[in-house]
Amino acid sequence: MNAKNLSQNSKQARAKSGLIAAALLVWILVPTGAQAILGIGEPAPSFSLVSGDNKKLTLDRLRGKIVVLFYATRDTVQVNDDLQNYLDTLYATQPKNIQNQIFRLLVVNAMEATSLTTWKENLIKTSAKLKITIYGDWTGDMFAAYRMRDNDSNFIIIDKRGIVRFAASGRIDNSRFEAIKKLLLELAT
């Protein structure tokens, strides 16, 4: 090998190590899970959930409906209350034909439930209070398949064909509510 080839190989190695260092830096600086939630256009993975009163629900049963999914841990269920209230009002003001196309799905990560009976009782009470069935992800299968962010509020819209049309985690700013409304109404018509 001559000096020219060694110099070229050395430059390539430095460039490669620079790229690796940059990728590692991005990985370190990006909050855990920020890049992980499902992407727009991806097929929604199947799921199987159970409510506090043992009602079972699967994605297959929701085909043909727009799924508005809120997934949170016990400590983060209130993070997106403003968005939930906004969407509840939007839903209530829509004609029946639009309401029938939208399924509002509230899921709580229940993987760490120490007392299933207590958790289920609380899900039943909260479901009655909110007038909507809340489901538990008892096994963590949905959490893993949907690449949910841990200890955060996750919000996903799935279209009638089972394709993810919106996905975000953390608090969703009020400035995005109108765009979410527009998307939902477009999907329903």
Feature locations, PLM:
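A short beta-strand-turn-helix
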Residues: 48-66
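Thiol-/selenol-based redox modules, centered on thioredoxin-like
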Residues: 151-189
